[in-house]
């Protein structure tokens, strides 16, 4: 375990140097890993584990997702099973179903958690809010987590490029004395570049805050506010979109990712530099109270309850689709669709 200084704070980090793939294979050589769910994280994690030489099976209900698993090379009756059968065969159960689905199938999973098995998560929601989800594992199994900091699609594509995605990890329950080794081996096996230590609660709180904040909710709100302001002041849709979204995603974000915002501030025009320095304070002051309110809503379980209650309503899917359609049909994103078509690589 390496100790890395992040901005003056030392954290425990596991890298491929400390825990190489060969060691991971040795740790898990007698294990059968069942990946439950072939939706968001399931395909990337299961295929990466398979390609890295681990003994992997998939548990998935019949339907379109089951058919997708077959297309990806999983063989019904050999490496692709019902959720119940996969749980029976596994020594490590990767519980990668959606939060709502985890609540639904938990009785089946729990019934097959015999002593010594490991229950693996990639998100701490079900455990952190187990007073609401009723996902309470027996005391004689390991309960562990590796949470990739990106989508399952990114996990797979970076793996195929010979790279890796960063992940957090946590040990909730070590019944066998092997929980940490199992966690490290699985993290390396799914293609993590490096792993930093956290807890189930902290992963859940930061993840839910991020999704509702800068990763999705806040950025959509911020982009829309600027786009609307430009449109209301006479700017055309294409100009408003290019100045709000296109320049951000195509020019600035790649540099932001490679070199950091501090580098961008030091390497832009003097006009942009002065304006950015002057206005970052007002934007910080305007949004900080919103983030504090959001974090409190996450930490108290309010956001979890909203999610659970919403998903349990019989008409939720219909209403959700209507919300998503409204977003899709909005002027800003219809403009974006045309702007993307006009990019040189798409012409």
Predicted regions mapped to residue ranges:
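NAD(P)-dependent Rossmann-like dehydrogenase/reductase catalytic/cofactor-binding core
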Residues: 2-6, 10-17, 232-347
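NAD(P)+-binding Rossmann beta1-loop-alpha1 motif at the extreme N-terminus of oxidoreductases
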Residues: 2-77
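Rossmann-fold NAD(P) dinucleotide-binding segment
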Residues: 82-135
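Short glycine/serine/threonine-rich phosphate/pyrophosphate-binding segments
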Residues: 40-45, 64-67, 102-105, 128, ...
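Small-residue helix-packing motif on alpha-helices
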Residues: 66, 86, 102, 237-241
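Rossmann-fold dinucleotide-binding core
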Residues: 120-212
